[in-house]
From Swiss-Prot:
<feature type="signal peptide">
    <location>
        <begin position="1"/>
        <end position="26"/>
    </location>
</feature>
<dbReference type="InterPro" id="IPR000680">
    <property type="entry name" value="Borrelia_lipo"/>
</dbReference>
<comment type="function">
    <text>The Vlp and Vsp proteins are antigenically distinct proteins, only one vlp or vsp gene is transcriptionally active at any one time. Switching between these genes is a mechanism of host immune response evasion.</text>
</comment>
<keyword id="KW-0449">Lipoprotein</keyword>
<keyword id="KW-0472">Membrane</keyword>
<protein>
    <recommendedName>
        <fullName>Variable large protein 25</fullName>
    </recommendedName>
</protein>
<dbReference type="GO" id="GO:0009279">
    <property type="term" value="C:cell outer membrane"/>
</dbReference>
<keyword id="KW-0614">Plasmid</keyword>
<feature type="lipid moiety-binding region" description="S-diacylglycerol cysteine">
    <location>
        <position position="27"/>
    </location>
</feature>
<feature type="lipid moiety-binding region" description="N-palmitoyl cysteine">
    <location>
        <position position="27"/>
    </location>
</feature>
<keyword id="KW-0998">Cell outer membrane</keyword>
<dbReference type="Pfam" id="PF00921">
    <property type="entry name" value="Lipoprotein_2"/>
</dbReference>
<comment type="similarity">
    <text>Belongs to the variable large protein (Vlp) family. Alpha subfamily.</text>
</comment>
<keyword id="KW-0564">Palmitate</keyword>
<keyword id="KW-0732">Signal</keyword>
Amino acid sequence: MRKRISAIINKLNISIMMMIVVLMIGCGQQAVEAGKDGAAAATGGRSLSEVLMEVGKSAENAFYSFMALVPDTLGLRVTKDTKKNEVGGYFNSLGGKLGKASDELEEVAKKSEVEGAKDGPIAVAIRAAVDTAKTTLSTLKEHLESLKGIGDDDKVGEATSNQNGVAASTDELKGAFKALKGIVDTAGKEGVAKPKAGDTAVKIGNADNKDGAKVLAAAANAGRAVGDKAAAIVSAVSGEEMLASIVASQEGDADAALAADATAQTSALKFARGGGNAGQLAKEAAKAAAVAGGIALRSLVKGGKLAANNNDDDKVVQSAGVTAVNKLLVAVEGIIKKTVKNVLEKAKGEIDKARAPKATGQ
């Protein structure tokens, strides 16, 4: 009986000792955790590494957020039934998406500015990276949202039989020019290559498409069926070439109609303004990108109408206008995506650099 009692007591003693050891180990671990990467009390009860891990996750979210937003915003494709103001709404919506990406970046900075660490080197570095990125996104947003009123209730490139061409609103034409130029210039500052206009003339080989420029007559019709020629000019260049030709214009080109024969130096903005003498527009030396850019602007900007002839030429003319606008939209979308990608990658790099573990004494 005594042996059994003694054995039970020994087992209890061993159990008690094991519990004491476990408790001591647990207390030691808690002490180590509390001291890891600085006092937990200074970071709202979380260790600094936990805070930084959260910041890192937010940076990843910021990097992918814009691309995740793209599918339901980018990719607008104009048809013969699309109204000009719908394209304006698209630009405004895209600006709003940039605003959301900027808001998410702001959350990254706020999460790094925890109590006791707001003025610390890590939070300061992250705040600087975020503010730099937000400045660029804000600039793009302003340019895009300024295009909200680019159009009216007319259909893109709308044309009727024997329709006289009408120059677009001078103010809106200038506004579109400044916004597109602002987007391209901002992209260039972020390492995105500027689009190039190319040297293709309206006469390509034996195909003389110069009469296609007559759709840009103002206060006059095209004089003959030239929709197919206009379509050929638009198909000869890319959207990037059209955009390059537009932003290479001078704002003053929108002030007055073309009063002399078009040359290789005649800008897209001047072609969009057009002129009363269709023959002065239709010159072999004219650059295809400038004419196509002019067709896109005339088709899209408030008040603008393309000139057409009869026998269904109006349908071909509108088709050329729609194609030109679609090409231009794709070019603008491409530059926006590349710019945002570069901006967020740069911000993420700076944030990760700030988050990286530092050697003792650094």
